[in-house]
Amino acid sequence: MQRSLEIARLEAQIDKNWDAYQKIPRRKFIGARTQEYRFAQYIEDWRIKVERIGNLNYPDEARRLQIYGKLQLSVAIRADGSVESVEVNRSSGHRILDAAAMRIVRLTAPFSPLPPDIRKDTDILVITRTWTFTSSDKLESE
């Protein structure tokens, strides 16, 4: 009898753990050199939009003070195109540029919803890119 109760308790715990596990979002991490075809067009469209908005909103203070540099940024995009998070992985060394990159992501959002072929196994797409604020006052992403 005691053994049956213990087995039932363990089965209930396993079910609870499994349910919790199923609720964890499936994340896919993509860098600049991704080889998977199904991500290529989405990433390219994302890059074009970010650079267009970034160049329209290039930080005036950086331009005025002639501050240039590179930083690495990760942007987590939900399936509906909204931004879950933005994180500076490697700073440019200039607070102005790091803050500008995060601001540009917020201005650019929302992004296009993830296409069905990506959504089939991805709930959150994390795009990591190097952003360069150039001496010609342009934003480039690689």
Ranges and model annotations:
Residues 4, 8, 33, 37-44, ...:
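Soluble non-cytosolic domains of exported or imported proteins
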Residues 45, 57, 100:
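Short Gly/charged-rich anion-binding patches and loops
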Residues 67-71:
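Short, small/polar residue-rich loop motifs at catalytic or cofactor-binding pockets
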Residues 58-63, 117:
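Surface-exposed patches in mature extracellular/periplasmic domains of secreted proteins
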Residues 1-30, 51-54, 78-90, 99-113, ...:
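Conserved "boundary/linchpin" sites in short secondary-structure elements
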